[in-house]
């Protein structure tokens, strides 16, 4: 009989304990699975697209994801997430109406600071409704979440995490790296958000960058965060904490940017780049679109889309675009809603919805005309397509500033651009091979990373869950004051030390000068009187030559030409010399 292998003997020995091992393994699996709540912003559906993609990936890892959404907000049902509804100020229809009203304000030039405050007020009012909803808060606490994901566009997420007493991480769906993250941000080469600057600045640009930075910090500190602090005070949220503390309390910052797009800058261990969540290979086009694209032949086609959030363009801009596009030899497919432009070319196809990623991945595409939305730019970069960008609001300007600086596209200002400038920009990115070469190079850099952005996101979420918030990644910057951070205490010590040294040196100098003057005065007057005692002037004299208690002598030889007295006071005078 052949010998029984050792591992078989081990299995036979463990057979009676198999149920216990199975139970232990199941317990380990359950412990690794987590319950995560996401607080998306009350508008901007593009942000929700990203969170749905992340939720699906988390579901594959065994995690549960819950979206906190207002009643009436439309979202496709899925087994990958579930919904916790609440009565908010917006549903899908009213949210879209509000956003489109702001778009009309932009095109009419009425988007002033008051309009921006109105948007901020809507966010804070919705937060007030959430925090004040006791039934909702009770239901959320009973869920016993392991982690909360905060979109910084919805600052209420910090307040909700504090109320629930749960760990939280920031998942920024926009191109946003605020100073509140805590990472060093030298203004000499780190452009502030909305500054429209690159990492190479001249003197005037650095001045502008500094001014924008100070305005941003003022706005966050005195306009944004206090609104949410008042909400916490109103509803007696305990323990009391400032919004700054809550922002700094994030376990991790996952930012939707990428080394291929962002300018190099200092960062921290708890800040990771996960830009490009929605990027993926192109799928086959629907038959009608495939036939239309194939009909473009060697000229190719141009894709035009301003994103899901921009449904209507002003008539002036739409006509400029239509006229410029009509002059191109390429075919044009344009995602468009509203009234048809009056000068639309025969080469242009209007469509209300299109498979943007699949069109960008088609081999016959020549260029992309976009608003510079971050999701669109990452899809464009992924497929290596040159772009002409017309930013409209938000982070569109910063995104397109980077695209242009990287040599992948051209930025145009919708307020000042002409139809000719738009046409020339499109012709340039289509015919100048450097734009496509640079776009393809950035595509290689973007893809040459450890895993897809979705997988990296899931990895980091698992990481902070495994390590109970990963406090070891947090720098000490979160526990020191601004006074210490900017070394103002050191500057004060040096200033006081320099002042003390100045006064000590000044006092010593004054004393030395005073003593020197006194000694010099004594020497000078002794010489004038011509009196020495044992070769040393005794200092007892008068200007008329009288010496107290001594006989007055005439010393004619003391007077030389010019009348200057010369007294050799190195020895005593003899009577013969005085005679």
Task: List where the protein language model places each region.
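Glycosyltransferase specificity loop/lid
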Residues: 6, 12-234, 261, 275-283, ...
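Structured loop/turn residues at beta-strand edges in well-structured enzyme cores
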Residues: 143, 245-248, 266-269, 346, ...
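Long, low-complexity segments enriched in small/aliphatic residues
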Residues: 246-261
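C-terminal membrane-proximal segments flanking the terminal transmembrane helix
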Residues: 552, 569-570
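Donor nucleotide-sugar binding/catalytic pocket of nucleotide-sugar-dependent glycosyltransferases
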Residues: 252-256, 269-279
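Short acidic low-complexity segments
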Residues: 154, 237-246
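Intrinsic disorder/low-complexity segments
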Residues: 559-562
